[in-house]
């Protein structure tokens, strides 16, 4: 492999079909040129290529133009991060999942619990954690909601612009108690436009347009979509829209600038979503977000900086439109602001790479139910209501990390000191990776992490729940070991983990003068352990790909005599098979089968169930059509007790890509 370096841009010429994942570790702009061993594109003209039957396969292995790749590296950042791939557009780009939630549901480490269908509202948790214990990143930027994890996944992006999704382990400091999920947006190719229209059962309609332009170091990705349905049962209708753009600019003198901005609006009927006693619930949310990142190398030094902002407005109606509401009832209004900034520097030297940095985050909420009482209420924009409560908090993290490679062994360690209204918290992470032989490696890591109580944990009180403003942060110590094997088109991974959590926040059944209620309490220690296995094969002809995965886990809590709401309500077993078949003449089929077995508790009871999803597509040139069905077997299943999920849902659509 020949390497040239000029003005901070590294160029590689590769004579193989292998992926470019290794370049992500550089954290730089990489320019790649690829040629097939079988032939040189210099001597191949278009007419002769079209006349030979084997050239289709050969052309798939060639890149006519050099492809500029901006590495989505999270380092330098606090902690020793270890990414695990969840989704890749290259493998599952035509899978029968139209939503990000559908993709995440199949991964053995992720528990996706939906209210409604097609991604209307979803809680995402990792390895037995809760939705509040999972950090959500978009292009490496933390956009986790400080009010409630119910809103953390409200991101203005669709699956068509998602190039990859990773689980991130090893983040220290405040936020990623159980880990993080990072979604990366990338264009289909440097210059394109894509439109999609689909429709189906239950009045479903989806329209989407996206595209990208790349010129002289500048890349602009933009997308917009509308998704609506009448609902599969009464009061599960929805009307959601997304707008998103990502702009990157690379200059040898100024470095790399990476900017993103988005807006989402959602209106959805919430039949029993948060309480089965109220079938006429309704929710309206608006989310706006933006961030800018900068990266510049100066010889052995690399400087990184970013700033971000996320605003979420929420109107929750226990009685939709006030119908049947008692006198004096008003909706719940919340507006949450999350702002953050980070700066770090890395230095590469003979003993490895050393980095140091700091970040700052500010959380604030105005609400008519959450927070401390305002002296002077503030009118809710566009509503006949007032914000009567507010709360704000400042969070700091500072870290120092180092990584080194000694032959086939990679070592990394990080120390972090976090500050918040709850005091200071030291944390750390360690990671070791051993290359056993070509294509086979083993790794182990340990991380100490924490999370702050959400504003809902602290203050939410209603007819069935009681908040607790005296809650303190949760703490966790997580250990993980694993091994990976890769040979040609086959790859496999096996891992096991153990997490000890203390000061766990959970809702505990408490007797009150008004009857039994769920009170936000801090009394539980929780031990969680599990295994994950995954194997996949990418074929050349009829079999495009096949992936088999399994995840199993168990948890035990110290306060066994208390009935808790979330601690033992987890996915006990999950198995999935994903298969893609090239039928020929432009036809392709994708089938996924998955099995779920959730742990039962004294307050919940779930039956194991199978789900089968399928998609049939036909493509020619820039045009493709498809028909797909989710829950093809019409399985009756629940992510939450009593809240039935959608039955068989058939849709069909048309896609034009130019």
Question: Where do the PLM segments sit?
Answer:
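Gram-negative outer-membrane beta-barrel transporters
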Residues: 405-409, 498-500, 522-602, 655-657
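Short acidic/polar hinge/loop motifs at secondary-structure boundaries
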Residues: 141-170, 183-186
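Extracytoplasmic beta-strand/coil segments of soluble accessory domains associated
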Residues: 101, 105-141, 145, 163
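Short strand-turn segments of transmembrane beta-barrel domains in outer membranes
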Residues: 164, 172, 179-213, 224, ...
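N-terminal periplasmic "start-of-domain" segments of outer-membrane beta-barrel proteins
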Residues: 65-95, 123, 180, 244
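Structural signature of Gram-negative outer-membrane beta-barrels, strongest in the C-terminal barrel
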Residues: 351, 355, 365, 381-501, ...
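Flexible loop and strand-edge segments within Gram-negative outer membrane beta-barrel domains
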Residues: 229-236, 240, 254-338
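Outer-membrane beta-barrel signature, preferentially recognizing the C-terminal barrel domain
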Residues: 274-297, 441, 448-502, 510-539, ...
